[in-house]
């Protein structure tokens, strides 16, 4: 039997899982339908589609990890399961981070204005090389996840020895301690793509400032399309920074939770907050993307009419 706190955790994480799958699945579905109709897909939609697929994987791994560690800690003490979950989490986490970074860099290159030769060269080449860049991100994520699987597997013998010397609760702490150092290290390495996204954000803000100074010379009475594009992209990046900050902090909380007296509560809280990043940011993408927002309005209108009939 689960405690009231466990039931609340189950309700919250299930609700977040459903919303995350619906939000990311909706983006993938709209882009896929548009791809079928037009027989081609834009670079933005291509990156978005790959991004939401990686987020669906990340959401699934977070939910599985949360349910197992919070509700069935005795099952989690099995080293092979820990290795499998940690490996898949690392792969999905890195893939999502790099794909998000690609989207942020793409926004910057397409929207920002600059006369720098390197910027102009990247602006011309980005559409042609984006598929190779995403493939490279996939390869990096796969390599990192394989490395962590190898590193964690080395502790299997020590884990097997500890199994005969400690009870379930103590062994849970031991097993978490085994994976603390490599997981923390690879958590820190995820800062690299985030720094690239942060640089793109500040450069885009700088581009908007320069553009605003230029249009002030002309009393147009409103914002031009370039300004609107800058603002939408900056809002998207700002929401990403906010959600990623929450995700990163709570991921570290989950990693360090074995040091806390109430590790189960810390673990549950960390998992619930962490899933907000891959779920919540996707809804921001829908709101700030004209095509996705208009498609959602049409869909909701059809649902409303169907319910009335």
From Swiss-Prot:
Most taste cells may be activated by a limited number of bitter compounds; individual taste cells can discriminate among bitter stimuli. Its main location: membrane. Residues 1-7, 72-82, 153-184, 261-266 are extracellular. One of its GO terms (cellular component) is plasma membrane. SUPFAM superfamilies: Family A G protein-coupled receptor-like. Keywords: G-protein coupled receptor, Glycoprotein, Membrane, Receptor, Sensory transduction, Taste, Transducer, Transmembrane, Transmembrane helix. The gene is TAS2R8. It comes from Pongo pygmaeus (Bornean orangutan). It is found in: Membrane. GO terms for molecular function: bitter taste receptor activity; G protein-coupled receptor activity. Receptor that may play a role in the perception of bitterness and is gustducin-linked. May play a role in sensing the chemical composition of the gastrointestinal content. The activity of this receptor may stimulate alpha gustducin, mediate PLC-beta-2 activation and lead to the gating of TRPM5. Residues 29-50, 104-131, 206-239, 288-309 are cytoplasmic. This is Taste receptor type 2 member 8. Belongs to the G-protein coupled receptor T2R family.
């Amino acid at each position: 039997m689960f405690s009231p706190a466990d039931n609340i955790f189950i309700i919250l994480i299930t609700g977040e899982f459903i919303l995350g799958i619906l939000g990311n699945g909706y983006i993938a579905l709209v882009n896929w339908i548009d791809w079928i109709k037009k027989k081609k897909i834009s670079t933005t939609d291509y990156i978005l589609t790959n991004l939401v697929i990686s987020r669906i994987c990340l959401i699934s791994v977070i939910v599985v990890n949360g349910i197992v560690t919070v509700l069935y800690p005795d099952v989690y003490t099995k080293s092979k399961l820990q290795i499998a979950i940690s490996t898949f989490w690392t792969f999905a986490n890195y893939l999502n981070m790099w794909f998000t970074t690609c989207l942020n860099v793409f926004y910057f290159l397409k929207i920002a204005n600059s006369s720098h030769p390197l910027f102009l060269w990247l602006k011309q080449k980005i559409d042609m090389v984006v598929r190779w860049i995403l493939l490279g991100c996939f390869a990096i994520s796969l390599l990192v996840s394989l490395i962590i699987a190898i590193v964690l597997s080395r502790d299997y013998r020590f884990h097997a020895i500890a199994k005969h010397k400690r009870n379930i609760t103590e062994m849970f702490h031991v097993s978490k301690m085994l994976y603390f150092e490599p997981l923390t290290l690879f958590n820190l390495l995820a800062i690299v793509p985030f720094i690239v996204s942060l640089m793109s954000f500040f450069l885009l803000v700088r581009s908007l400032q320069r553009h605003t100074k230029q249009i002030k010379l002309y009393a147009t009475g409103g914002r031009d399309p370039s300004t609107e594009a800058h603002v939408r992209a900056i809002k998207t990046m700002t929401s990403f920074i906010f959600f990623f900050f929450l995700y990163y902090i709570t991921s570290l909380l989950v990693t360090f939770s074995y040091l806390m007296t109430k590790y189960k509560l810390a673990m549950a809280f960390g998992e619930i907050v962490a899933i907000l990043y891959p779920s919540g940011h996707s809804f921001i993408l829908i709101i700030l993307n004209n095509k996705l927002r208009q498609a959602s309005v049409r869909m909701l209108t059809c649902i409303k009419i169907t319910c009335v009939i």
